[in-house]
Amino acid sequence: MLALGKLLELTLTDHEPAEKTQVTPKGARLRWLGEGALEVRPAESDDCGLDLLLSAGIHGNETAPIELLERLLHGVANGKIRPRARVLFLFGNPAAIRKGERFIEQDINRLFNGRHELSSGFEALRAAELEQFARVFFSKPGRNRLHYDLHTAIRGSKIEQFALYPYKEGRKHSRRELARLAAAGMEAVLLQSKSSITFSAFTYEQLEAEAFTLELGKARPFGQNEQVNLDKLEERLIRIIEATEPEDESSLDGLQLFSVSREIIKHSDSFHLHLPADIENFSELSKGYLLAEDLAEMRWVVEEEGARIIFPNPKVKNGLRAGILIVPDSGQRLG
């Protein structure tokens, strides 16, 4: 095994490799770019024209996606996977990964799209660094660009594996990409309708990549992810890396689509979310339900048919999103 194929080990030990570039048995070049960052470049004759960014560990306690990327990188390094795409592997928050914690000072996935410039501390610096890694990686003209940011969730979910598809004005969500997600085992996709400050939103809005946040199950410690089944996703990622996907894939069978109806914003310390602490993502809420209250008699009452809640979190900082109210989407606006 090439030393650079052990990116997780290098990250966990906070070790900088002496050898920054190595070549795999299949002729692919591995290049260490910095802490938690490794580029895989296929042999020139193998290059299919795709630039694929795979990120995990934006939250340090979300280990199943980190282990998945490590398996893929091992496959490339030992020659079992022959890459035809350029791939950038990123472990988002190395310090938090080493501690097994969600973050050190603040949620790094709320610091992209320039938000880090309004903040300070370790995570703000790392968000800026991750943006730069992505910006350089996606700077080559005339290539297809794809970014999967892999996560697991704090809480359980009625729909265990789902994706969030960022928004940019004037740009349509791609049916082809949704079919790819369905083939990768995603059960649902949330089609977002406003700009965001997550990593995938940055690469989608600023770098013209097709980009997604993938939620893959419940967050657990390293070595305890037997219940998180990523077989379909792993198989699909290998196909993407090796450029062996079916060319005419278009089926969305079994894929549920949702759109954002409203975001619940916490404005003050008086904010109260009227939901059980253990409520699962995608739980249905009945029409007329009092969802949340805040200062100045501010109230959020469910008005939508078929409404569901995802990412409820009353402990966020004031001014941030404390939950998202979503509704089924017909998919009529897909490109």
Curated annotation (Swiss-Prot):
It catalyses: N-succinyl-L-glutamate + H2O = L-glutamate + succinate. It comes from the Bacteria. Its cofactor is Zn(2+). Keywords: Arginine metabolism, Hydrolase, Metal-binding, Zinc. Its EC number is 3.5.1.96. Pathway: Amino-acid degradation; L-arginine degradation via AST pathway; L-glutamate and succinate from L-arginine: step 5/5. GO terms for molecular function: hydrolase activity, acting on ester bonds; succinylglutamate desuccinylase activity; zinc ion binding. InterPro entries: AspA/AstE_fam, AstE_AspA_cat, Aste_AspA_hybrid_dom, SuccinylGlu_desuccinylase. Zn(2+) binds at H59, E62, H151. The active site is at E215. Binds 1 zinc ion per subunit. One of its GO terms (biological process) is arginine catabolic process to glutamate. It is an enzyme of class 3 (hydrolase). Belongs to the AspA/AstE family. Succinylglutamate desuccinylase subfamily. NCBIfam families: arg_catab_astE, PRK05324.1. Transforms N(2)-succinylglutamate into succinate and glutamate. HAMAP family: Arg_catab_AstE. This is Succinylglutamate desuccinylase. It comes from Pseudomonas putida (strain ATCC 47054 / DSM 6125 / CFBP 8728 / NCIMB 11950 / KT2440). The lineage of its organism: Bacteria, Pseudomonadati, Pseudomonadota, Gammaproteobacteria, Pseudomonadales. The gene is astE.
